[in-house]
Amino acid sequence: MSTSPSPSATTSASKKIIDKLNLAVAGENAAVWAFGYLLSFIPDENKNYAFSIFNLHRNNRDKLRLRLRDLGITPPRPKEDYELPIVVKDMVSAYELASYVENRLIGIYIQLYAIENKSIRRESLQCALDGAIRILEFKQTPMALPGSIT
């Protein structure tokens, strides 16, 4: 009796991973757009940090896109425009938007972590943990249920 998974189980797991990778790319695309938008509301003394987060999300997106390409999948393209869930008027609301984006990405990375192969799931967990730390750095409180909208 063989203990190897059936081809359909492997295909199903692969589809789930591809779906979550696509979701993560879409989330990082939105994060790049959002951080680019909110940079104009960040004071000069905090701009370098904000730019580093913008670049971090761009790098995360590019790594995820490469993983999809390695699987023979064309990654989702960014939208031309995104609807802001928070009206940004000043630095405080810019940090609220940044926290909202990070919270949503934490939820996506946790979903990806839950279905990934154990040898590669550390990166997803690290992305989720780093997002929670950034929320604290924005002087916001991480949500008890990461990825929740409210």
Where are the model-predicted features located?
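All-alpha RGS (Regulator of G-protein Signaling) helical domain and cognate RGS-like helical scaffolds
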Residues: 1-150
